Amino acid sequence: MLINKLWLLLVTLCLTEELAAAGEKSYGKPCGGQDCSGSCQCFPEKGARGRPGPIGIQGPTGPQGFTGSTGLSGLKGERGFPGLLGPYGPKGDKGPMGVPGFLGINGIPGHPGQPGPRGPPGLDGCNGTQGAVGFPGPDGYPGLLGPPGLPGQKGSKGDPVLAPGSFKGMKGDPGLPGLDGITGPQGAPGFPGAVGPAGPPGLQGPPGPPGPLGPDGNMGLGFQGEKGVKGDVGLPGPAGPPPSTGELEFMGFPKGKKGSKGEPGPKGFPGISGPPGFPGLGTTGEKGEKGEKGIPGLPGPRGPMGSEGVQGPPGQQGKKGTLGFPGLNGFQGIEGQKGDIGLPGPDVFIDIDGAVISGNPGDPGVPGLPGLKGDEGIQGLRGPSGVPGLPALSGVPGALGPQGFPGLKGDQGNPGRTTIGAAGLPGRDGLPGPPGPPGPPSPEFETETLHNKESGFPGLRGEQGPKGNLGLKGIKGDSGFCACDGGVPNTGPPGEPGPPGPWGLIGLPGLKGARGDRGSGGAQGPAGAPGLVGPLGPSGPKGKKGEPILSTIQGMPGDRGDSGSQGFRGVIGEPGKDGVPGLPGLPGLPGDGGQGFPGEKGLPGLPGEKGHPGPPGLPGNGLPGLPGPRGLPGDKGKDGLPGQQGLPGSKGITLPCIIPGSYGPSGFPGTPGFPGPKGSRGLPGTPGQPGSSGSKGEPGSPGLVHLPELPGFPGPRGEKGLPGFPGLPGKDGLPGMIGSPGLPGSKGATGDIFGAENGAPGEQGLQGLTGHKGFLGDSGLPGLKGVHGKPGLLGPKGERGSPGTPGQVGQPGTPGSSGPYGIKGKSGLPGAPGFPGISGHPGKKGTRGKKGPPGSIVKKGLPGLKGLPGNPGLVGLKGSPGSPGVAGLPALSGPKGEKGSVGFVGFPGIPGLPGIPGTRGLKGIPGSTGKMGPSGRAGTPGEKGDRGNPGPVGIPSPRRPMSNLWLKGDKGSQGSAGSNGFPGPRGDKGEAGRPGPPGLPGAPGLPGIIKGVSGKPGPPGFMGIRGLPGLKGSSGITGFPGMPGESGSQGIRGSPGLPGASGLPGLKGDNGQTVEISGSPGPKGQPGESGFKGTKGRDGLIGNIGFPGNKGEDGKVGVSGDVGLPGAPGFPGVAGMRGEPGLPGSSGHQGAIGPLGSPGLIGPKGFPGFPGLHGLNGLPGTKGTHGTPGPSITGVPGPAGLPGPKGEKGYPGIGIGAPGKPGLRGQKGDRGFPGLQGPAGLPGAPGISLPSLIAGQPGDPGRPGLDGERGRPGPAGPPGPPGPSSNQGDTGDPGFPGIPGPKGPKGDQGIPGFSGLPGELGLKGMRGEPGFMGTPGKVGPPGDPGFPGMKGKAGPRGSSGLQGDPGQTPTAEAVQVPPGPLGLPGIDGIPGLTGDPGAQGPVGLQGSKGLPGIPGKDGPSGLPGPPGALGDPGLPGLQGPPGFEGAPGQQGPFGMPGMPGQSMRVGYTLVKHSQSEQVPPCPIGMSQLWVGYSLLFVEGQEKAHNQDLGFAGSCLPRFSTMPFIYCNINEVCHYARRNDKSYWLSTTAPIPMMPVSQTQIPQYISRCSVCEAPSQAIAVHSQDITIPQCPLGWRSLWIGYSFLMHTAAGAEGGGQSLVSPGSCLEDFRATPFIECSGARGTCHYFANKYSFWLTTVEERQQFGELPVSETLKAGQLHTRVSRCQVCMKSL
């Protein structure tokens, strides 16, 4: 039973493990010697047969069986009952045709049909006769200059020239550097140099004195002021409208009491202009500066035709061309032979001061005496194999040993230096790997292969072997430190124990311990089995040359000799190097305070720390003064008195005074240093190993809808280009940094089989099926370095990069080889004081220093007695205006204002002042004050940088004397006006002008008559000039991660990497598991606290240049440091070696003008000048005959025009437009995030193996070549250094189209491109005969807008405008706004060059304000300038984000109800009918479109047509009793021929007895106005006698009565929509309209007119009662008519 349970348990465990492993990754690497990849395999014994089980339950019913066979026939049945009546039969046949009927009556003729569609076009006409062949056209203009061709082949060597002695030969090659010359005498002082570039802005000067009182400014924009004092009574208003004549006559109210004084009346009209003022008392202005050069005048009239010139003589032969490009680098030379042994070095020199200059080490000495007793002998021969041991039993693990005592705390180690140490001791043997394949045959030894049939048990552990052989002799060490003078002898008391230090780093393995005592001899053990082959030990370093050996037989080691006697004291050596600075001593005891002499009064010290608050002072007299200007920086204070004697420091360590010391052992690694400053960008290192794949990225956010008229998506990736021309060989790069140690290599490749060749490659297999995506494999080994491919084609020129940040100072170069020691020179004379140095870069802000010692205490003087108040002074003269006062106390928070209107867009703000310092950080470890480091050597020349930003305006260089050029003279006096010349010939078309301002919209053109034939597609144009690079694009939205790529094939095994530098010891890991299965790595520990700063170590070797780091974020602009004081002039140094050529010097003083030189070479073609004005139109020529069609040559594309001004931002379009053309390539963006891992490429073709196996040594660097001309874009460079190792994600899914970005700002102007290729020359035609004078042409289309005209004179002052409609003033609280803060000071501009003084012109008129210029690039942030004058009002600013809600203000007084303001009209119309003779005014705030007469409806052919009184069609501008005409089918129209009628809204005039006509009609016809309303108007009806309210947010226009319907012509009439304003008439009348007869021209009220009105309905009558009939007489009519109100939405 127990066995069964165990069996079940094992099976369960196996199943569980299989299930658990089902979803996991199978990992084939060995794990602790076990095979963990498969499931458990268990083979227990088979169990005995079990007991029989109980009887099972009854099974379910089986399925239905198959159908049986057919049975026998039954007996015949009985007769059935009769059936029901059957259905109807089918329809019968068609009967015979009937008799024809009678003819019908003719129908009424139908209406004429619609005109038919346009017929198809007619047939083409006959071709015209072919015209006569025209004369050939004139010669075309010469083509533009083509781009420079490819450099030609190097020409053959020229013929020798016999040069007479007067000619100067060609310049020879540069000679070898000459020896240093003798120091020349001191030269005379040089001329002062040219004015240098503008220095950095100086410190802000003190505020200047207040200026004189300025002229009155423009009238400001006032805010609503506080409520004023009540005004006087206004003028009487105009007479009101006549009263409504209703049925009830209103007698008026009794007179009330006298009211209180009224509100102020409306603002009066502006007064008339006052008399002109007296002339001002200003003095005559100073002479103005010379005016700018005028714009080119208008072209003169056309001149007479010139005669044809004579052909010029042929030109002279050109001069010899410039030097060609430098040739390619030659091949590497063969390694030279080994040189001879050099001359012996110099002996010891002793200079004048007695200093010994030691020479090089001497030759090896003679062999020494026989040595002392040697160590243990070499290992003996190998003994015979022992007997195989017994199989070991697995022992029981021992008990845990007792816990050891805690060790003493170790001293703090010095900081180690990162060096590449020698190879370490061999590590412990690893576990046995799987057996490898047979290796290649060993070339050195021949061994018999031992065939082990079965592996034996492991043998017992052998004894420790004897001591190994002596190692090779080590390298001689450097001299050690020496402190001959000893340390400070005073020993301080022991300090208090410090706090426990942070966890130290894991130390390196300790040194090998001393050998222990020899154990007693063990019994002879049996011979062990052959052990595993140990790993190959590392090669030792190369030893120095050994001593000569005299004896051929190695002697036995002698006994150890006695200790030698004390040697004599050696000669005092040279002073050793400075020792390591000791630790800071403890504070000394207070010294004796001797009475010092009183020093001079010191300058004020630095402010001390904030003291305790003092007691409150007595109240002072007087008002607070204005703050004084900031003082200049004070003088430098004198040095303080020497401090008191400190306590004696601890005794220093005296090193033994041995000058030629040997290297000590390597120190323990120090604590990690603080992070250094960001290094400069390193050179590319060797390619690192491929990083592991990153995890899949998060899905990107979906893009927004693409809008039309914007650049489209990038096109598909083009096909691979053709291979490019071979590029020039690049310079050898610096050696890369040593890579990190490579991973252990995989199984070695099979050894070479000499004599056999590689077989031919097999045929390519078929495409396999796509496998499932594999899991992430182990990192592949680095592949072999591929053979360099052919250089690619010339790539396109890269875009202009963004200006790089200035690189940091380069690292110090490697020290040069030391030259021969020079003899120490005498002290030179003190040099002349140097020029002030250039201001250095602002230093980085240092860490906060230690708290200084307390300053010396000077006795504080007693406070003086309080002075008596002085007598009042005399009244002074009126002072000049004071400087601006201090900002007042902040006002109490005013009441909350209404939301202001959207402001204008402001100019870009000035860069802000430095922000408030952040909160104080944690206290840093005190840094030691560094000494000023030596200037670094010049770095290696960097690669060519990106094109920089345009520099500032340079200093004008002195003009080179050129032939036939004179300096520009002063501007001459103005000549008298010349007479008008003849019209000149029409000039050539000028260059494309700058885009003018947007012209006014042109008049619409007439539609074309003939549709043009669609032309053939023209040939592709030549490549246009490259556009300007766009500004840097904003970072795009991260796309979705792509699908995982397929696993790449394993690369070819790479060459072994160079040994990497030893890394710093890692942090201590967690305790590993005891089982031999690798545990998962633990989480990263918390960073330890910073250790104490170690003492300064010796200077380490210069490390290799590191990999380039990622591009850092742009740092914040540091605070400008104070300008340092110029240092005292230093003593002259020893003459140095000859330096490298210096940087170009600054421009010297401008020399005098030299004599005219010989004519210079023809310069390159200049940039096109600014376009001239268009010439006058030429005289009309005579019409020529038709020429033959010339060959169609596509013209050269013109140069790209200058970019136009930035357009206003358009409204977003609707819908998804078609993808636009690909946009111009933007400027180089910031460095993007590391890209996702692309799919694995196909395996490359095997590289070509070059025949040479020996790599040559790099050649010496060549001399610098001449500056070449601007080359073409070079070939694509080699692949850059590997990016930082990051997890490469799978390729993302394509994102949705992004939103189009806003239109970018204007880019910088690009460099003009090369001129296009010249077109093919056409055939020269015959000269045509002059044609006849043509007829004047039609008026052409409107021309392009002209240049802006000259500014006109100031016009007379316009008359005062009419008072505008008052705006809608919301009920606002009176807000008292405090004056805003002063604006930031503007940046001072670069001072311009001084122009020539012009003649004094008359004082010009005040110019108009210019348009805002194109915003320039942001200049560098200057120091704060002086406060600028008040600027012009800025453009409206963008609406800022909504501010936080302010505290609720105090309740202000209620303002007067404002007049309704004008809002933006959007085209709604509103019709107002007055029902009187007067034209009704439009409601306030609406504009009147037209006025007219109120037409209600018309009747024609006994049919009525109604007009809605709320629509503009009911207000006809002109009145007629017959406002329409009728027409019939015969295309005949009649007017006033029938009894047709028109019906008009009527007035309140009494009903006449007879029809009225002509001049009596107007008093009965209602007038109307059509108004433009800001929103829709509606009518609301109460169905009650009360006036309904407008909906919330709507305002009332008028109230009235609900007019529903009307009839007049029998049953004909019309009605009003109850939502229309026409259904609400202001006056109620039983007969609100009058009938006019068209034919008779009369109007009258007839008895068949009825008006229908909405009636009142009580709430209870809705469904409960029947309507009761009633008749209302005059006087009661209003009681049953519904009231209404017309409302409009308030905006």
UniProtKB/Swiss-Prot annotation:
UniProt-annotated stretches for the region 7S domain: 23-46
Q: Tell me which species this is from.
A: Homo sapiens (Human)
Asked whether the UniProt record includes Protein transport among its keywords, one would answer no
One Pfam match, given by its short name, reads: Collagen
| Cystines in this chain | C1482-C1571, C1515-C1568, C1527-C1533, C1590-C1687, C1624-C1684, C1636-C1643
Which GO terms fall under biological process for this protein? cell adhesion; cellular response to amino acid stimulus; collagen-activated tyrosine kinase receptor signaling pathway; extracellular matrix organization
Tell me which family the UniProt entry assigns to this protein.
Belongs to the type IV collagen family.
Gene Ontology terms for molecular function: extracellular matrix structural constituent conferring tensile strength
Indicate the quaternary assembly.
There are six type IV collagen isoforms, alpha 1(IV)-alpha 6(IV), each of which can form a triple helix structure with 2 other chains to generate type IV collagen network.
Per its record, how is this protein called by name?
A: Collagen alpha-6(IV) chain
Domain of life of the organism encoding this protein: Eukaryota
Keywords, comma-separated and alphabetical: Basement membrane, Cell adhesion, Chromosomal rearrangement, Collagen, Deafness, Disease variant, Disulfide bond, Extracellular matrix, Glycoprotein, Hydroxylation, Non-syndromic deafness, Repeat, Secreted, Signal
